[in-house]
Amino acid sequence: MADHMMAMNHGRFPDGTNGLHHHPAHRMGMGQFPSPHHHQQQQPQHAFNALMGEHIHYGAGTMNATSGIRHAMGPGTVNGGHPPSALAPAARFNNSQFMAPPVASQGGSLPASMQLQKLNNQYFNHHPYPHNHYMPDLHPAAGHQMNGTNQHFRDCNPKHSGGSSTPGGSGGSSTPGGSGGSAGGGAGSSNSGGGSGGSGSSNMPASVAHVPAAMLPPNVIDTDFIDEEVLMSLVIXMGLDRIKELPELWLGQNEFDFMTDFVCKQQPSRVSC
């Protein structure tokens, strides 16, 4: 079949100007002008058509060589399909389905950030300190996930519940209805189940009140983040709720060590702990 096409092209281009009758572009019949005096004018076009001929089937739909060039060139075409010399080779095939997509913009990365915030939602904490300078407005569209009301975490460290260490002396609660603090600089109650709401979080935006642990300042890096629902589900899954004698859950480590040492000394027949 190739010999038949070459014979047809030999009859079509009898003079064989510059040896172009052996070119794949002319064997495929991709030339636009049949007369020989147009070949020298269209020689770069024919050469680029032959170059792009094997890439046309990667495009979408059926197209000829010229439309394939313009489709593959995208917005970088000049002079109706002739590529500029400084154009990168990757830019000529930027619409091919085998090429990587362009660099994602900020709008493309926003859904991924929102999905990560959904996955990390249990690590957001309602903290009494207003960290305005620690909370840059990175994702304003995802702010509704940070100021939600379904936050089940509270700060279980009582040393952060006082109101005298906050700017202006206003204390705050780690959960709505949690431990309260006096607005004049007085110490708040350490009872985490108190009924009075904190007054320190009222002068803060809702998007700043819930900040992730990685964005907290270093002075509260030792704050305990405890989710009671996750903890209880872990206890139920391990069967610890059915075990009645677990002194290490109710006593400190020193008392537990003392009890185990005392019991082991009283009963020497047992294996030592």
Curated annotation (Swiss-Prot):
Residue ranges, annotated region (Disordered): 137-204
Subcellular location: Nucleus
Subunit note: Interacts (via C-terminus) with SMAD2. Interacts (via C-terminus) with SMAD3 (via MH2 domain). Interacts with LHX2 (via LIM domains). Interacts with WT1. Interacts (via C-terminus) with EP300 (via CH1 domain); the interaction is stimulated in response to hypoxia. Interacts with PPARA. Interacts (via C-terminus) with TFAP2A, TFAP2B and TFAP2C.
Gly residues: compositionally biased ranges: 165-200
GO biological process, one term: response to hypoxia
Family designation: Belongs to the CITED family.
Cross-referenced InterPro entries: CITED
Purpose of the protein: Transcriptional coactivator of the p300/CBP-mediated transcription complex. Acts as a bridge, linking TFAP2 transcription factors and the p300/CBP transcriptional coactivator complex in order to stimulate TFAP2-mediated transcriptional activation. Positively regulates TGF-beta signaling through its association with the SMAD/p300/CBP-mediated transcriptional coactivator complex. Stimulates the peroxisome proliferator-activated receptors PPARA transcriptional activity. Enhances estrogen-dependent transactivation mediated by estrogen receptors.
Pfam families, per the entry: CITED (PF04487)
Keyword tags: Activator, Developmental protein, Differentiation, Nucleus, Repressor, Transcription, Transcription regulation
Main location: nucleus
Assigned GO CC terms: nucleus
Domain of life of the source: Eukaryota
Any GO MF annotation of the entry: transcription coactivator activity
Protein's recorded name: Cbp/p300-interacting transactivator 2
